[in-house]
């Protein structure tokens, strides 16, 4: 059985070497869908009876391990030195420094790496 839980969050970023609008500072409303596969629990009297995993637990783990950190943060590549210097000059600014350029593909791969071990 597969189950999916969708969460949304807002973050800013830029793709520094891109040739179009993406090189400018901007933000998105991101959606992450977490799909888990497993057997349905068949345990009479258990609060998990009939579930693969409690949806509230899926949400809690995602928030603790990814969403709360990235929500309303600016995701910046470590190599984007001008932007990184600027963001570091802002007191209390929520900045997440990444080892990769924050493209949708790289963010998806990072999210998978962070969350895959959480749900095992």
Locate each region found by the language model.
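Charge-rich, low-complexity N-terminal segments
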Residues: 1-120
């Amino acid at each position: 059985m597969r189950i999916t839980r969708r969460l949304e969050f807002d973050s800013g970023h830029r793709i520094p070497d891109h040739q179009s609008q993406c090189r400018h500072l901007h933000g998105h409303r991101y959606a992450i869908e977490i799909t888990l596969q497993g057997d349905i629990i068949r345990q009479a009297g258990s609060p998990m009876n009939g579930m693969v995993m409690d949806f509230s637990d899926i949400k809690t783990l995602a928030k603790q391990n990814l969403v709360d950190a990235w929500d309303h943060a600016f995701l910046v590549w470590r190599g984007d030195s001008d932007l990184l210097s600027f963001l570091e000059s802002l007191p209390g600014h929520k900045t997440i420094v990444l080892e990769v350029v924050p493209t949708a593909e790289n963010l998806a791969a990072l999210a998978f790496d962070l969350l895959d071990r959480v749900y095992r």
